[in-house]
Amino acid sequence: MGEGEMIGLHASVGRGALALALAFCAAPALAQADKPAGPGQSAPDAAAPQNGSEANEPAPGDIIVTAQKRSENIQKVPLAVSVVSEAQLKASGVTQFQDLGKIAPSLTVRPAEHPVNANVSLRGVGTFAFGIGVEPSVAVLVDEVPLAFQARAFTDLPDVERIEVLRGPQSTLYGKSASAGLINIITRQPTDTFHARFNVMGTTDSEYGGNFSLSGPISPQLGYVVSASYSNWDGNVRNLFNDKKVNGREAFNTRGKLRWEPASNVTITLSGNYLNGSTTVGRPFIRMDPTALLRKMPGQTQAVTMPGVTIGPDNQNISNNYNSRTKYEGGGGSLRGDVGLGDLTLVSITSYDKFRLNDYLDHDDTSSSAAVGNNIQVGQFHSQLFTQEVRLLSSSAKPFRYTLGAYYANVKFERPFLRGPAFSPANWYATSKSEQIAGFAQIDWEIVPHLILTGGGRVQNEKVSYTFRDNLAAPGSQFFSGSASDTAGTYRLSGRYEVTPDLMFFATYSTGYKGQTYDLTTGFNANRAAAGPIKPERSRDKEIGMRAQFLDRRVTFNLTYFDTNYKNLQAQTIETLADGTTNFRLTNVGGLNTKGVELDTTARIGSDLNLTGSLAYLDARYTSFPVAQCYPLQTVAQGCTGSPARQNLTGARAIQAPKWKFSVGADYSPSLGGNLKGVAQANWQYQSSVYYVAEDPQTFQKAYSIVNVGLGVRDKDRKWEIVAFVNNLFDVQYYPSLVNTAGNFGDNTGNKIATQAVLPRDFRRYGGLRLGVNF
């Protein structure tokens, strides 16, 4: 597939864009109004975030977010919202999407052997499933445009202005992919004057990269911003079979915007993006029974199948005779129009996105020359997404304000898959389609001074369909297809009381919804087809909180308590076949409760020192999961009973849900005389223990903490900056993902312990140098 095909917009999008542009150009004849405030804002009173270099400075005034689809002071929003600025990303050593969990404690990002299998969770809730068409519980948006695949986000974060993390169900305003929350990545807007930014970086372990951004006016009515980034890292795992490093990545991203203001009340923004990258895969064994044989085959010992590899918790070596890797390419565009109509703002967002990923995996993870050591897995993921949203916003300055909207989405997925030939053979092709239409509304009413009540609702209809062809099945049992439709509603009720301009209390009750889907993975058969789709996931959330600022708004203290119940949570379990092979199955968990406390705080001490702190206490447990799959090697004494074997996880802690997690950061810029200022940055992250598979001791990660630091010098006006940094200062080893692969190893007495790890970027301490120039 060529680059032009990837970024070309569907013809219907082009026709819609042309019609939208013509309609907006005609708007001045229909209404005389002030110029709209910009994307996501209501006219004429919402303030736009700064786009120049000074945007990185901690502002003494308001932090503006678009969590409720209009620009608001974060301290006035009755939701659990946290904002991460570009400066915080740099100070914390965060350059990739998967690093976000280090500075947003309620957020956990779990990597995998390739980006599609990685997943995101908020407050212990996420969708951990490999099947196509399975929606995430945490939506990811870029400039308010949704991504069909979360994998689309697992790359560099260039030209980011801020990242908004909305915790808890957000289905009322954002739809069915936000039943646990959402992440909105906001990129920079065109500036009124020319501005250029260049950044380069290199590390002691051979990572290098850079990015640039150019922005400015083309004419008084037309502005632009264009950015690009490139990064390359060999990895931190060595494949002894060919002496090459793996677990690395290479990525190129580019993004551009044109903002046209044909009239004082009209703003049209055309955006486009393209990405191209690859990853190399290496999952070292950190535990293995010394008597284990590959697929229980005589003679296939560790010394034969993994020569030179010393298995242990510090292992960074593998021996694979097949090059496990992924290659991906994606592109898309959006057209946004904002029209001021007196006290109203009409917003339209049209988007199209296309993404393709090819994955290649050494399925046995060895270099054995026997037939059993040459099992490979090859597949592709294709996605196409078209969306259209229209909303009407009233003025934020009035005591009664509202947001009305309609949304349409059409998404298509394809997945060809091949595995074999020695064991666990598979050869199938699946497609999944979804079409949804929704209407939503939210009303805010200040019934008496300082007391605001909010009510919102959403009604949506979705039709899902699939095809599945199993090329290895017996004639007559090869092809399946089906469809289902569902209409559902969600709502949100809240009240907030502003005691003073700097102190607010709120209470919120909201519901979430994630649509039904089909389990299109290896093993799909007539029984699964007859069972129909996996049930929709529903959630009910209660929150109370306080938003406070002190000392002339130099100290911010935001506290939230939440209690959320999930019914029919869509989750992935392990299915162990008669030969010991494990497949993954999608199922419904009867119930899950997640409750806890979140704290976000910042302090500006003088003009040189800025402190940040975030903490999350989480108690996430299954309230009903009596028939869960047993994990590999689980015994009767460990709770695996019955026929077929199963375990009761009711009352157990949810996976990937640490009880405690916090992040503390400091950014100090003392004057060094003249035009120079020093740079001293530190970030400390802590996470308590987690299971990656429920109650499986082989996937248990103990508590750990990581410290990142940086020292440098910069111009007082931030025209340039040089920072030397060290990540994982104390060289702490941890695993963001563990996989129990006992099904592939054993002897004539049964399967044996075998555990593999996905190593994080900072598995070992490393240093680097970062240079930035702004003018």
Feature annotation, model-predicted:
Residues G2-S92, D99-I103, S264-N265, G333, ...:
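N-terminal Sec signal peptide and the immediately downstream disordered periplasmic leader
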Residues I7, N565, Q685-V693, V713-F775:
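C-terminal beta-signal and adjacent terminal beta-strands/loops
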Residues P58-T193, I544:
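Acidic, small-polar-rich N-terminal luminal/periplasmic segments of exported/outer-membrane proteins
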Residues A118, E135-S137, F149, P158-E161, ...:
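Outer-membrane beta-barrel translocator/receptor signature
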Residues N184, T191-T193, M201, S213-Y322, ...:
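Periplasmic-side early beta-strands and strand-to-turn transitions of outer-membrane beta-barrels
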Residues R259-A263, L392-S395, P399, Y407-A409, ...:
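Structural signature of Gram-negative outer-membrane beta-barrels, strongest in the C-terminal barrel
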Residues S334-G340, T345-H363, E498, M504-K514, ...:
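Membrane-embedded beta-barrel scaffold of Gram-negative outer-membrane proteins
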Residues Y402-T403, L453, D563-N565, T587-Y691, ...:
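Gram-negative outer-membrane beta-barrel transporters
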